[in-house]
Amino acid sequence: MLTTDRLAELAKALSSTGITQITGQFLYHHGGFSPVHQIDPDQPIHLGYNPSVAGLNLNFNRVFFEWTRNGQSYDFKLEGRDLQFRPKANTVRMTSERRGMEVFKYAQTPELENWSVARSALGKGGGRWLPVRRPGTYTADVFHSLARHYGVALPMPQDAMRLQAHRRLCHIDSAPLSEILVDMLKHSVNLTAEGLGRAATRQSGGDYSTLKTSARHMQEWAVRQLNMPDAQFVDHSGLGDQARITAQDMVCALVAAKKLMPSFPVLLRQIKPRDTRGNIDRKSKALIQAKTGTLHYVSALAGYVTEGVDTPYAFAIFTQNLDRRARLT
């Protein structure tokens, strides 16, 4: 996924062409993927795992919010923060309010994304990631700052709406798809799942205009290719609470995936076997390659046992604690 430091490489490459300013327009384009405000509209607005989804996605569509105490008030920073560069996010604004339980509130104007935070939640200082809901504007704004850092003066960015005739001056390549998949599976990155899912739908000729239509196309493909007759998808990440999948469907999908792509298990995490007390079983020779899934009241594990057993097999374990869920809701 695109990060600020990778975007800085593009700004540096632009500078190396000898361009120092442009007199026309600075346009950005989503590559044909219309922006989606958030994956699941029923989730709280401030959750970073429920970001917007578009063709331009920067820093997992998150902005870093940092606050420090300054006497009786607070100083705020909103940055497209990365390891090397920390450009200010000019398209996002934060204010504080004296109010009760609701920690964050969000609103938009034509120019800005406006957040407010309850002062009682701030303490002495701290920082956290917040989602951005206009990822194209955010990405272009960060690039505008990075270009200025490398001596290229650009006008304020504008949404191109549709791609126009153009000539490529420079580019950067993404990581290989296999690396992107490994990162997605390791860190459970919903945005990556949605981006790859929509891209796959477009590549196969389906309707990718919304997450729901794209997910329906994926569902139809999964029924045909992965033997998942009971699967119901409303997005590509599984975040929406209307999504349904059985353990049987998951096992069928794992078996079919290995046939379609024999190297698929190596994308998964290697998990060491444990005994009935939860301790690592050092005597076991089993090789478990699997994906974990954990929420407040749900725990899941699905993958393969490929070595150390008489017959390799796929498995899926889904568990939930309904009493805990009831307490949370």
How would you name each of these model-derived features?
Residues E9, Q21-T23, P51-V53, F60, ...:
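Extracytoplasmic
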Residues I19-T20, G48-N50, Q108-P110, S174-L177, ...:
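Extracellular/periplasmic catalytic domains that process cell-envelope and extracellular macromolecules
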Residues R86-T109, A140, R167-D173, I280-V309, ...:
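Short, Gly/Ser/Thr-enriched beta-strand-loop segments that form substrate-interacting elements
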